[in-house]
Amino acid sequence: MADQQLPDSARVVVIGGGIIGCSVAYHLAEEGCDVVLLERDQLTSGTTWHAAGLLTNFGSGSETLLDIRKHARNLYDRLEHETGQQTGFVGSGFIELATDEDRVEEYRRIAAFNRLHGNDIHELSAAEIKDLFPLADVDDIKAGFYAEHDGRINPVDVTMAMAKGARMKGAKLIEKTP
């Protein structure tokens, strides 16, 4: 349940109770900051519930992006443990498809970079893709790059877990504040 009374003061005021606002409130509260989050309607009532929630490592061509993606994956596990609130993670895997040789070479470089940094990416032939995904039309596919441990989260569940975690760490979250 949302806190209903506006405090007289706060060190930080976060505007918006979507996944970004709740993440900011969570992380600042974790650092001991006095945080108030104001949401004009209800948590997740804006664009958060429209998000796809893809959680992938493949495609990262920089160490910084890989670090951010690894942090996110670890955060979702930690949130579930800390709050008891599910994040909706489903480890469905992720596959990137290449339809021409230039793309195959580009994805091979990305896959090698990812493997160098501990991400398990497998190059698959069209036949192997068909074995994994029998309904796939692989006629134009040159190769696929499969990240078995990737998947998706439920953005609403993650937001609610972050909100709960933020409250547990002392943040005030106030809804219905137009």
Where in the sequence are the language-model features?
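Beta1/beta-strand and adjacent pyrophosphate-binding region of the FAD-binding site
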Residues: 4-20, 36
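Helical element adjacent to the flavin cofactor pocket in flavoenzyme catalytic cores
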Residues: 146-178
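Short phosphate-binding/catalytic loops that engage adenosine nucleotides
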Residues: 33, 119, 171
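Gly/Ala-rich phosphate-binding loop of Rossmann-like dinucleotide-binding domains
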Residues: 25, 29, 165
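Glycine-rich FAD pyrophosphate-binding loop
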Residues: 29-49
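Dinucleotide-binding Rossmann-like beta1-alpha1 core, especially the glycine-rich loop
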Residues: 53-132
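Short loop/edge segments at beta-strand edges and connector loops
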Residues: 39, 125-126, 175-177
